[in-house]
Curated annotation (Swiss-Prot):
The gene is USP10. GO terms for biological process: autophagy; cellular response to interleukin-1; DNA damage response; DNA damage response, signal transduction by p53 class mediator; DNA repair; negative regulation of canonical NF-kappaB signal transduction; negative regulation of stress granule assembly; protein deubiquitination. It comes from Gallus gallus. Keywords: Autophagy, Cytoplasm, DNA damage, DNA repair, Hydrolase, Nucleus, Protease, Thiol protease, Ubl conjugation pathway. This is Ubiquitin carboxyl-terminal hydrolase 10. Its main location: cytoplasm. Its EC number is 3.4.19.12.
Amino acid sequence: MAVNGAQYIFGEFSPDEFNQFFVTPRCSVELPPYNETVSCGIKSTNEEYQRIEFGVNEVIETESSVLNNTDYSISSTLNPQAPEFILSCAPAQKTPDETNYNSIDCQFSDPTLTLDSGSNAENDGLSGGLGQRERKKKKKRPPGYYSYLEDVSDGVAPTEALVNGHANSSGLNSIGTEDTELTGDIPSLATPRTCNSPDNSVDFVHEAVSDDSVSSALDNTRTAGQPEVCRVTNSEQFCIPSETGRDSPLRTAVVQPYAGTDTTESLGVTNGQTLESSGEDTAANGVELHTVESTDSDQAKPEEASPTTEATATVAGSVPVNQPAKSWASLFHNSKPSASTSVVYVETKYTPPATSTLVPEKQVEVKEGPVPVSEDPVAIKIAELLENVKLVHKPVSLQPRGLINKGNWCYINATLQALVACPPMYHLMKSIPMYSKSQRPCTSTPMIDSFVRLMNEFTNMPVPPKAKQALGDKIVRDIRPGAAFEPTYIYRLLTVIKSSLSEKGRQEDAEEYLGFILNGLHEEMLTLKKLLSPHNEKLSVSNGPEVQTVREEEEQDEQGEGSEDEWEQVGPRNKSSVTRQADFVQTPITDIFGGHIRSVVYQQSSKESATLQPFFTLQLDIQSDKIRTVQDALESLVARESVQGYTTKTKQEVEISRRVTLEELPPVLVLHLKRFVYEKTGGCQKLIKNIEYPVDLEISKELLSPGVKSKIFKGQRTYRLFAVVYHHGNSATGDHYTTDVFQIGLNGWLRIDDQAVKVINQYQVVKPSAERTAYLLYYRRVDLL
């Protein structure tokens, strides 16, 4: 090809296009003379382009080289303004003490390599210098042009290498004539190479030839998603492939060791990203990391590193499209910048292998359900506290607060308000310390923890003196309720403890939820109590009588009738069995709400059999038309009733009757008016009838068991109402619950409907209403007020 005319090799261009695209030469890198450490070339031929890689891992014989000049340079092939398109560029002289080189850019032309060189980076005043080139007026650039000089200030040449018109990390560093010779060959990894190039671009990477010619090549197809970083040190070259693609993350490349070389730079590879030093002051200034990464691929995390210098790295990502161009002219006219080719720079911190860059964070195992008490270090402290706790029945004045209801939690909110108004319950929970999640990540008592937290949501108010209690209504109106809150930790107990109340489609019942709370608290306290006495067998039974064996029955029969604490039970084959009263395990919950009823069964020609049953709520049947008041329901409870259809083993029908009496009265008596009647068909109907209930309730002696009538005084069987839970609606489904509570600090009553709190008079509490019916009645013993 002639070199004296204004000829170009990649298509036909008009003079305007020539002046626009190819008028400015570019700075290039000069390599040392070929008679010392020079490059070895590998040419790869494909259908649409030729590819030549170069390195410095062999010494080229003088007679076999195609390079005839001692000073030469190889320039880029991608940038349309690069000087390889102009065939008449004069080579520049090499500076002897030059240590940094800009780029390795080469072209392949028929039959020999065209060696072009511009001025060095230091020669800013020359026509080929980058400084002069940057100061020129910006002209209209072709669509595919990549601006790689935007970050360079005036008069200063870039220090990074430029490959295909873009900043690249594979520049030559510290190559001089004083470099040592290689004692061994470093095999070049024949992986296609790609740089940060625009779409529809073709990459030509050449190497200096070795031995006969540049005809020895590896047939490797260029892939847009598989970049290869080529690096040259004083006496070696590393070609490290780093594979990136749309569907695969960066892979870790292995640097092959070499022997007999003396390098002054540290090299590192981490996940296909090559760390290279930028000059002699690498330890001081750091190392730059350049990689081509697809924007759609996952972010690669460094796993290995070889350099010992901590560095700040920059990662550039782009998504080149692998579409071969028909000609360079069509490439310049038709290529359009893609929106996916934007370069993003991410500042990352590189650390040496002594300290791992990825420290796996230890995940704390969070258990949804309660843990055993043996795994809870706080359990023993709570157990000791509950063992020595003394119930406080002193009335407490609390600032009222509503409860936010974002679901169907009205039956829970109504029950919670009644329990907060119960002084012994409030004082009990306030005596237990409240632990944070950091202090107690796993708990064996979720029910206790939740109610301790609930009671701490309410603050005390000063109790007005008796002189002002006469003006109770005025005092109440001067008190403002606190802010409403949502007790989500209480709602969560239904799923944590896996109660049947959490089953989908189950009837939401305030009385059933109250039993769920009280039984749950009792069981947790029983477990804590067992922690203090692990060898006590009685604690393994929550509540219930112990049945004696037949031998014990015979011994008891020989001793006589027995004491008042004994009870009889009909065992198998209708044989009478005598059993002592069970030793019930007491907890603070049973000390507040727990009572006992005595159920006696009468049968002809047989001894009476009695059973003691504990209760938290006393169930009152109000279905009969004769029952109009709570007193009527209590008398109906203890009335003797006959049991029909009972037959013996001889198929003879026997008349049996049963009677229930109150054996023990609790400090807090909860009466359940059974308004829901379940039919044989499976349906449920609500009994809409008014049941009168007094503020002060006296349990008559006729309701008590014969053995305790003389032991319980009048003050111990007289109760005062302090809370009422109402059920709204005429059906069992789609119901709503509200609560009226007595506030001692206000000396009056409050009506709480979820988050709404208002003051009412006492007659409104006991007055019958068509829109609501009393469902649960909370009474306190007057001797404990």
